[in-house]
């Protein structure tokens, strides 16, 4: 009886529950007030159907009508029991407009039950109104991929139920509000791809349930808060591409659930914390492009789930970490651009799932482990620019290899190339450049590589002549070929027609002993890049070259060309597209006559180098008439050009060099309109003008060279805030230099104080978009010795006012220029005392104030300038004790001669070495001493240049591939720790 009663009661409860659910599902769910509020919200914005992501997909709002239940509208979800709208999803709805504080979304209480608001992937603008806090039940807020701007309102801290927040891919700025710490239920927080700045608030450590933190691609700075170590549920920590500094917190090693860490492109220093080896769930660790030192911790051998390890472009040292061989799941290992040494382990095949191994630009030695070629999954091996040596062996390559990229260039391999390389039939990229083959090479071994697209066999040190027709007929997919430095035959010795040759896009034949212009090029309709520099090609450049439809980089430098076919007109018809030429290098040839006017028919030209030829006549007037939006570098130096500089020159120029010609007249005032101009060099001409003070309006001007002309008159206080090199020597400037003359030359004050180097946005980045560099050069004059600097370096700062008629005292403001390296004020009429403020020039390496009327003592402060390698105080009226610094004691006696009042132990030591005193000014210096001085000066300057950290140039670049002769243009300064720019 009791059992039956219980069963009946249970059935009654089930029936009532069913009826309740049935009633809920059949009644009208959407409250009309909520429906009206949603429609009002939609009408606040413009719908742009033409800019929709997919015009074939109907818009969500098309189903929103007055006579239908809003709970069935697309993007709307209602509470099943009470009918309240709880989710509003308008993602991908092609909406444009501003989210106002009085929007119905916040103003009307009918929408207060919303838990999800998704406005992602639209075109919303403006700021987030603080009235957002009225949606107090929100758990999900997604505003990603719009154009929102401004700051995150601090009122967001009142949305205490938030679990998911995504503001990525907008234009937000400002700091993260500390009120974020009140969102105690938050699990995912994404601010990536915005303009946020400031420090990450320590209150972020209060988000104890956070699993995902993404702050990448912003401008956050400062150290990471140690409170990050309290986020014990964190799985993804993505902080790349910011300006974070300091050490990586060791407390991150406590976050045992972490699967992904990405800290690349910041300014972290110190060592990788050993504690990170405790992260047993970690699958991806990316730390590239920082300033990390030390070794990869041996504890990383415990990360048995690790799939990606990328520590490229740091300062890591030590040997290859053997512990990494325990990582059986590792697929990507990038050690590129560090300071790792020693040999690579022989048992690399332990990394059985490895797909990419990149150890380029380190200091590895020893043989290449053949075990690498026994890893079936391996697709990419890049080991360029190391010191690997021995013969190149490929081990027991299986009949089927997955290897697609093998780059071993610029090592010390020697011996024959093993035929087993022909088994790598899936290779798409092969670089064996600078391989010392020590004899003949059988190039047929490469003919089996039918998939090859990129082939670099430059500088193989072989006596074999490479037949271009055989090479181009063997590879049907070849796109880039570099045979530079090898002997190449471009003559068709077979029955092959040009139509049977593969059409490639990039060809490098520099220094190949070629004597005639390659005729097969005429049919290369897909050619983008052509380098036939450093050969022995004579005659004229064929006119058909400019008709190749997509050719945009040509290097003809260092040949013996004498002219151009069709030098006046290209002969384009009205329906032909103009040539695509962007960079043209023709320096160091024997071109004569006028500059060809067809240059003006190349509307996309960005770099033109005609330097070191025999062009004469005037610069074509058409170069002044064409308003090219592309031309950035124009180099006409060392020719025989005459006449005036064109009044209207290209307004997009970054670098203009017309030095060593016979130009006359004045500098065209239109130069002041070239707002992008960074380098102006008119040295060694016959220009007669006053100092171009009007160039102060050029905010990007960094190099100004007026030396050896006929400039005249006084110079007033200038405003060159970015000037790094100024050479006005050998002119007729006169007058006094005001005491505050240098106060606005802030670029020479201090790199640390005036430039934010943390983001890497320095001189090179302003002018470079890819990897082709154009180098500016200049000439320094000192004591009659000219030295040509082939590259203008960002950290190289020079002031040369020598050989003029300046009077008065050296401006005391010279002491502000703490980053000045070369100062030459010689051969003027300067008087008074040498300013003691010159003791502040801590970077100074060369000082010449000879041949003036300076009096008083040499400031003792100069003895503390530890980098001062060359100095000359001769032929003045100096007196007193010579400073006793080491740098003074290494100078020549002649550096102080004709200063009868100088004395002291340092002077006696210097002059006793050479058997004379500085008072013997009437005696001619011995030739040996002159030679030693010249050699000392050259060594000082060249030593500085070669030792300077990462030279940065004015550049014009067009392609993604980098020629060998541009790959490593600069070396590090071992004496001075100046930061470098990333690869």
UniProtKB/Swiss-Prot annotation:
Organism per entry: Arabidopsis thaliana (Mouse-ear cress)
SMART domains found in the cross-reference section: LRR_TYP
Native organism taxonomy: Eukaryota, Viridiplantae, Streptophyta, Embryophyta, Tracheophyta
Subcellular location as annotated: Cell membrane
CC annotations in GO: plasma membrane
LRR-type repeats, residues: 82-108, 111-135, 136-159, 161-183, 184-207, 209-231, 232-255, 256-281, 283-302, 303-327, 328-351, 353-375, 376-399, 401-424, 425-448, 450-474, 475-498, 501-524, 525-548, 550-571, 578-602, 603-628, 629-652, 654-674, 675-700, 702-720, 721-744, 793-817, 818-840, 841-865, 867-890
Family in the record: Belongs to the RLP family.
Chain's gene name: RLP19
Transmembrane as UniProt keyword: yes
Main location as per UniProt: membrane
Signal peptide: 1-25
Regions that span the bilayer: 938-958
Record's bilayer topology term: Single-pass type I membrane protein
Keyword vocabulary terms for this entry: Cell membrane, Glycoprotein, Leucine-rich repeat, Membrane, Receptor, Repeat, Signal, Transmembrane, Transmembrane helix
Protein name according to UniProt: Receptor-like protein 19
Membrane-side (Cytoplasmic) residue stretches: 959-983
Xref: Gene3D superfamilies: Ribonuclease Inhibitor
């Amino acid at each position: 009886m009791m059992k039956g009663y219980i069963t009946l009661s249970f059935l009654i409860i089930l029936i009532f529950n069913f009826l309740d659910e049935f009633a809920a599902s059949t009644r009208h769910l959407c409250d009309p007030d909520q429906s009206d509020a949603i429609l009002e919200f939609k009408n606040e914005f413009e719908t742009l159907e033409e800019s929709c992501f997919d015009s074939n997909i109907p818009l969500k709002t098309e189903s929103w009508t007055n006579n239908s239940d809003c709970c069935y509208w697309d993007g709307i979800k209602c509470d099943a029991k009470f009918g309240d709208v709880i989710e509003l999803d308008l993602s991908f709805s092609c909406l444009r407009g501003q989210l106002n504080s009085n929007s119905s979304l916040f103003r009307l209480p009918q929408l207060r039950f919303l838990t999800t608001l998704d406005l992602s992937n639209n075109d919303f603008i403006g700021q987030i109104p603080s009235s957002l806090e009225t949606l107090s039940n929100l758990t999900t807020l997604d505003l990603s991929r719009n154009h929102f701007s401004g700051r995150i309102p601090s009122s967001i801290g009142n949305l205490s139920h938030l679990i998911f927040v995504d503001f990525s891919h907008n234009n937000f700025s400002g700091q993260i509000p500390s009120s974020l710490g009140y969102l105690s239920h938050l699990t995912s927080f994404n601010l990536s791809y915005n303009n946020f700045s400031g420090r990450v608030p320590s209150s972020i450590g209060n988000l104890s349930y956070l699993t995902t933190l993404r702050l990448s691609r912003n401008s956050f700075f400062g150290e990471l808060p140690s409170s990050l170590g309290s986020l014990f549920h964190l799985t993804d920590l993505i902080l790349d591409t910011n300006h974070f500094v300091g050490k990586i917190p060791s407390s991150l090693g406590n976050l045992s659930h972490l699967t992904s860490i990405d800290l690349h492109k910041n300014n972290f220093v110190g060592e990788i914390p050993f504690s990170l080896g405790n992260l047993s769930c970690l699958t991806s660790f990316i730390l590239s492009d920082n300033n990390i030192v030390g070794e990869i911790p041996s504890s990383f051998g415990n990360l048995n789930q690790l799939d990606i390890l990328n520590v490229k472009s740091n300062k890591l040292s030590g040997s290859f970490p053997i512990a990494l061989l325990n990582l059986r799941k590792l697929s990507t290992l990038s050690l590129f651009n560090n300071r790792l040494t020693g040999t690579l382990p022989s048992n690399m095949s332990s990394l059985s799932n490895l797909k990419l191994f990149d150890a380029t630009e380190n200091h590895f030695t020893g043989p290449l482990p053949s075990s690498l070629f026994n890893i079936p999954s391996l697709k990419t091996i890049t080991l360029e620019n190391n010191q690997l040596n021995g013969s190149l062996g490929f081990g027991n390559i299986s009949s089927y290899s997955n290897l697609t990229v093998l780059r071993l260039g610029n090592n010390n391999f020697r011996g024959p190339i093993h035929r087993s390389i022909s088994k790598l039939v899936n290779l798409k990229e092969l670089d064996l450049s600078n391989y010392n083959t020590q004899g003949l090479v059988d190039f047929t071994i490469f003919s089996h590589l039918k998939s090859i697209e990129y082939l670099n066999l430059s500088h193989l040190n072989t006596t074999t002549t490479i037949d271009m027709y055989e090479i181009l007929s063997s590879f049907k997919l070849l796109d880039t070929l570099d045979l530079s430095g090898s002997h190449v035959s471009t003559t068709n010795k077979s029955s092959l027609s040009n139509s049977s040759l593969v059409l490639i896009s990039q060809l490098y034949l520099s220094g190949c002993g070629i004597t005639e212009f390659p005729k097969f090029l005429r049919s290369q309709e897909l050619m983008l890049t052509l380098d036939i520099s450093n050969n022995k090609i004579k005659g004229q450049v064929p006119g058909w070259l400019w008709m190749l439809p997509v050719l945009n980089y040509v290097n003809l430098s260092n040949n013996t060309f004498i002219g151009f076919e069709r030098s006046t007109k290209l002969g384009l018809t009205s329906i032909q597209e103009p040539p695509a030429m962007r960079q043209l290098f023709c320096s160091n040839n024997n071109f004569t006559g006028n500059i060809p006017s067809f240059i003006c028919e190349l509307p996309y030209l960005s770099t033109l180098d005609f330097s070191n030829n025999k062009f004469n006549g005037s610069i074509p007037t058409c170069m002044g008439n064409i308003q090219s939006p592309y031309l950035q570098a124009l180099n006409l130096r060392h020719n025989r050009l005459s006449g005036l500089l064109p009044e209207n020159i290209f307004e997009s120029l970054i670098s203009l060099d017309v030095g060593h010609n016979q130009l006359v007249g004045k500098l065209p005032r239109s130069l002041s309109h070239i707002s992008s101009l960074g380098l102006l060099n008119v040295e060694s001409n016959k220009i007669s003008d006053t100092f171009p003070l009007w160039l102060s309006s050029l905010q990007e001007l960094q190099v100004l060279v007026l030396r050896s002309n006929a400039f005249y008159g006084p110079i007033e206080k200038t405003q060159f805030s970015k000037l790094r090199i100024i050479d006005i020597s050998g002119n007729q400037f006169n007058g006094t230099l005001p005491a505050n003359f240098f106060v606005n030359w802030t670029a020479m004050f201090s790199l640390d104080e005036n430039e934010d180097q943390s983001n890497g946005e320095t001189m090179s980045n302003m002018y470079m978009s890819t990897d082709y560099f154009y180098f500016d050069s200049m000439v320094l004059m000192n004591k009659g010795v000219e030295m040509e600097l082939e590259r203008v370096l960002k950290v190289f700062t020079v002031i040369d006012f020598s050989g003029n008629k300046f009077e008065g005292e050296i401006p005391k403001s010279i002491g502000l220029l703490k980053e000045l390296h070369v100062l030459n004020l010689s051969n003027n009429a300067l008087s008074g005392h040498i300013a003691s403020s010159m003791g502040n020039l801590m970077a100074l390496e060369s000082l010449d104030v000879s041949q003036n009327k300076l009096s008083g003592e040499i400031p003792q402060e100069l003895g503390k300038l530890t980098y001062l390698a060359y100095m000359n105080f001769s032929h003045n009226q100096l007196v007193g004790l010579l400073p006793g610094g080491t740098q003074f004691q290494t100078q020549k006696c002649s550096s102080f001669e004709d200063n009868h009042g100088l004395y002291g132990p340092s002077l006696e030591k210097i002059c006793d070495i050479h058997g004379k005193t500085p008072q013997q000014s009437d005696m001619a210096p011995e030739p040996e001493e002159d030679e030693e001085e010249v050699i000392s000066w050259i060594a000082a300057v060249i030593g500085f240049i070669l030792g300077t950290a990462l030279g940065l140039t004015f550049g014009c670049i067009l392609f993604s591939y980098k020629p060998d002769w541009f790959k490593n243009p600069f070396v590090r300064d071992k004496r001075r720790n100046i930061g470098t720019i990333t690869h």
